[in-house]
Structures are given as C-alpha cells and as structure tokens.
Amino acid sequence: MYVQLSQRLKDVATYVPKGAKLLDVGSDHAYLPIYLLEKGLITSAIAGEVVKGPYESALANVSASGFQDKIDVRLANGLAAFEPADEVTTITICGMGGRLIADILDAGKDKLTGVDRLILQPNNREDDLRIWLIENGFEIIAESIMTENGKYYEIMVAESGHMSLSDKEVRFGPHLMKDQSQVFQLKWQREINKLEIALGSIPLANQTDRAAIEDKIQTIKEVLNHVS
C-alpha cells in the first residue's frame, strides 16, 4: 500500500534520522512508520497503540503494506510498548496534549537512556512539555509550527543535553521565537484577539482580572515585536 500522509505527519517525518529504529506512540493507523519505511528512511519500527480499534487498524495496514517483518504493532500504553532490547533510537509522540505527552515520557523515563531523539508534536500545553524536557535532561534542538484543519501544531525535537529557558521561551518556544514564522505570528495574533474579547467582557471595576489579561496580551505583543 502507498500511504498518503497528512502534512502534519510529513513535517514530523522530516526530523526522523535516516536508519532510525522508531517507536511511534499512539500510532493510530501506523501511517507514519509505513510511510518512513516506504521512503527507506528507517530500518524498523514499533507502532504502539493503547486503544483496541486503532490497534487492529494498524495491524491491518501493516499487513497490507507488506512490512510485517519491519513493523511490530503492539497493544500497550505509552513507552510500555518497547523494552531496551528493542534498541529504539527515535520516539515520535504526535497529536496529543503537551501535558499528556509529558506524562507518557515521565511514566517510562527510565527507558529513555538509550534513545537518541524525541520528536514530539503537542497540540496544546506546549509549555508543560518544555518544562518536563528541562527537568529531565533534554535539550530542544529544533522546533517548527504548522496549521492543519484549523488547529496549530508545534513540533519539538529533543535530544539529551542541558537546556535553560526563560519564561517566554518556555511558553513560546526558543526556536519558534527566533524564527517568527508566519504561522507562529498567526497563532499568537489569534490568541491576542481571544484575550481582547475576554477583556471586553470584564467590568472596568474588576481591575485584578483585567490586569492579568492585559499582562498576557502585552507579553505576546513583546514576543511578536522581538522584545526580549
């Protein structure tokens, strides 16, 4: 079978090192591992899925792809899908909340010693995930942002290392702040618009709540205007 990958997952695929042994957590239909093998970019993969329906769908797709000898589909929760003996070098976790991704990593962090790269694609709470990476000895070496079906997705590529981030970098992303892509600006301009609507609904007498929202708006404007 030939997999038509969404642009969101194609962007993730660009960060997978050639020759990697991949674990794709929450693999759903196993589209990403199949695509990477079709392109000759990885040597093997584990497709981990915790829900029975998507697990069975992944099994069927792997069978149709002819990659049964290269992709092992496992019904397991998070990093429980692999053991050190699997020699996984790269882990992808995509399309989940940042807090959930952090919880998945935390539950299996003892297994991360031999893993070279994490490729993470949260769709919210990105700051929670960056904090987890800081606290657990990972450095974000690359970031990107894209939009698909009206949602914004950030990609974080992390490897073992030391990282110190400012409060703004934790919230907005150290590389994304520097790059200031059009999508990044659109995401945060939309957030300003939401906050301004919220501000308009707060009575003038409620100065505490108004000041909190005004501070958030000011911080975003500073980032978009390159004020450190």
Where are these regions (language model features)?
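S-adenosyl-L-methionine
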Residues: 1-19, 34, 56-86
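Class I S-adenosyl-L-methionine
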Residues: 2-5, 99-228
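Conserved SAM-binding loop of SAM-dependent methyltransferases across substrates and taxa
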Residues: 29-42
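Conserved SAM-binding motif I beta-strand of class I
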Residues: 44-49
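Short SAM/SAH-binding signature in class I
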Residues: 87-95
